[in-house]
Amino acid sequence: MKVTLPEFERAGVMVVGDVMLDRYWYGPTSRISPEAPVPVVKVNTIEERPGGAANVAMNIASLGANARLVGLTGIDDAARALSKSLADVNVKCDFVSVPTHPTITKLRVLSRNQQLIRLDFEEGFEGVDPQPLHERINQALSSIGALVLSDYAKGALASVQQMIQLARKAGVPVLIDPKSTDFERYRGATLLTPNLSEFEAVVGKCKTEEEIVERGMKLIADYELSALLVTRSEQGMSLLQPGKAPLHMPTQAQEVYDVTGAGDTVIGVLAATLAAGNSLEEACFFANAAAGVVVGKLGTSTVSPIELENAVRGRADTGFGVMTEEELKLAVAAARKRGEKVVMTNGVFDILHAGHVSYLANARKLGDRLIVAVNSDASTKRLKGDSRPVNPLEQRMIVLGALEAVDWVVSFEEDTPQRLIAGILPDLLVKGGDYKPEEIAGSKEVWANGGEVLVLNFEDGCSTTNIIKKIQQDKKG
């Protein structure tokens, strides 16, 4: 179906809450420590990502919306790393620095796609003067379409009731991802987004969907909420509003690798969609699709517009289909963290025929993901002559992306995809025809990275050139 995404570029959202830095240490394990019965991890990769409220802001910015972030940090390396990472993804930060406290940091050690341990460095910000936070909210209210209060129970939202009142007085919707079981703190909010366990911690165990609805509607009435969205993991999510029938949305996740930060993605997409002028029902639709994408990634992650569009078209994953080069690199990185083997091939694919389909199916069988790099129209013309391509690039890529064997499609402008291949570095590079492996563009780079290069045979009797000739002959006849 044709999907029209919200106009995220005109959406302004402020996020206020508990910001933190997520650190990831990756490496192989091959032995047990002689000091204790624990694995020894040889760390070879270190990553730092914004977490908590900062991850919410990143999710908003990744959609192309204007994201502002307010929170409490220390004056330390973690705060500086947070600021730099967020500036790099167009999040405008306005942190309140507290010299007596460290920036909240969570360190995770992973090996073989498993998290071995998490170490938390924090003291919490309870008792810190909230007035600087209130001032920042007041200054922004005239230029934002939604306020997100991201509560991780670390102290930044100690004065959450005053924050809600400031926004409601200005007519700005307030969305809250709650951590406290004392929902009195959130009285008057526009929307609360508890997950099922958080919801049941307040209302008690719910055995049926009807109980969720009944108790949820009572919460709305008791705490003067405008709406309640209960995220229910593999059961999807349920939107409850006074005077309206419940809206239950099934999950769109196809593969679940990590639920870290999924709630951040949900509330981020909700806020950006509402701030863009869409209805709450539409916002929930897009948020549900985004959640299905992000749980297929490892660690706190964001969703790009093309991933979201692919997801609402029913292809939720790491972003199937046509991609830009940068989006492809992110998708490949996510696949590698899951231990998947990436195969790559390239060609013009002007008039797709049975030989192409058979070749691509065979290439896909050699790994877990298949990338098809396609010559641009200008590149094709230089390679094949002025009469080619018959089909423009966009149409060629759409057809390729619809094939079951193909995961990702990307274009390149040069005569060969050598630069593109060098940037992706697939585990296996394949090419059809009578080439020698060393003649294939990108082979040297793939070999140098420890990858493989393989030549596959095309199906006999299938040729785009022959198809074009036959069409021309039929026209003459």
From Swiss-Prot:
Residues 1-318 are annotated as: Ribokinase. Its EC number is 2.7.1.167, 2.7.7.70. The active site is at 264. Transmembrane segments: none annotated. InterPro entries: Bifunc_HldE (IPR023030), Carboh/pur_kinase_PfkB_CS (IPR002173), Cyt_trans-like (IPR004821), PfkB_dom (IPR011611), RfaE_dom_I (IPR011913), RfaE_dom_II (IPR011914), Ribokinase-like (IPR029056), Rossmann-like_a/b/a_fold (IPR014729). Residues 344-477 are annotated as: Cytidylyltransferase. Pathway: Nucleotide-sugar biosynthesis; ADP-L-glycero-beta-D-manno-heptose biosynthesis; ADP-L-glycero-beta-D-manno-heptose from D-glycero-beta-D-manno-heptose 7-phosphate: step 1/4; Nucleotide-sugar biosynthesis; ADP-L-glycero-beta-D-manno-heptose biosynthesis; ADP-L-glycero-beta-D-manno-heptose from D-glycero-beta-D-manno-heptose 7-phosphate: step 3/4. The keyword tRNA-binding does not apply. Pfam families: CTP_transf_like (PF01467), PfkB (PF00294). The keyword Metal-binding does not apply. GO terms for molecular function: ATP binding; heptose 7-phosphate kinase activity; heptose-1-phosphate adenylyltransferase activity; phosphotransferase activity, alcohol group as acceptor. CDD domains: RfaE_like. ATP binds at residues 195-198. It is an enzyme of class 2 (transferase). GO terms for biological process: ADP-L-glycero-beta-D-manno-heptose biosynthetic process. Homodimer. In the N-terminal section; belongs to the carbohydrate kinase PfkB family. Catalyzes the ADP transfer from ATP to D-glycero-beta-D-manno-heptose 1-phosphate, yielding ADP-D-glycero-beta-D-manno-heptose. This is Bifunctional protein HldE. It comes from Escherichia coli O9:H4 (strain HS). The lineage of its organism: Bacteria, Pseudomonadati, Pseudomonadota, Gammaproteobacteria, Enterobacterales. The gene is hldE.
